[in-house]
Design a protein with these regions (language model features):
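Glycine-rich beta-strand-turn "strand-cap" elements at beta-sheet edges
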Residues: 41-49, 77-96
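Short amphipathic alpha-helical segments
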Residues: 15-37, 71-74
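Long, charge-enriched, surface-exposed interaction segments in small proteins/subunits
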Residues: 56, 67-84
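Short, well-ordered beta-strand segments in beta-rich or mixed alpha/beta enzyme
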Residues: 3-9, 40-67
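Beta-strand elements of well-folded, non-transmembrane domains
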Residues: 11-13
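Alpha-helical and His/Cys-centered functional microenvironments
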Residues: 8, 70, 94
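Absolute protein N-terminus
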Residues: 1-2, 96
Length: 96
């Protein structure tokens, strides 16, 4: 059973480009992770401080490995002080 993840990150208004760069740097290494099916980064067209990842993972284990990866840990450090709040990360299963 695959898992879907929606992760929302809110940049501080004066830190949008720094947040965008930090998040963009996650895309390539994450897409190459074992178990990653989809990993897309979106930016809200009406609110440029609002970023969202839409993800699909083959298993809970693959998602857990992703969360523990070096590039995720490094990005968490980079985001300290430049985001409004902790990321809102929600995990879903597909119903239909």
């Amino acid at each position: 059973m695959t898992l879907r993840v929606v992760a929302r990150i809110k940049a501080k208004p004066d830190k949008v480009e720094e947040v965008r760069e930090a998040l963009t740097d996650l895309v390539a290494p994450t897409r190459s992770e074992c178990g990653c099916v989809v990993y897309e980064l979106l930016q809200n067209t009406d609110d440029p401080t609002d970023f969202t990842f839409v993800e699909e993972w083959e298993s809970e284990a693959a998602l857990a490995d992703h969360a523990a990866s070096d590039h995720i840990q490094a990005t968490r450090e980079k985001l300290k002080g430049i985001v409004e709040e902790a990321p809102d990360i929600r995990t879903y299963t597909l119903i239909d």
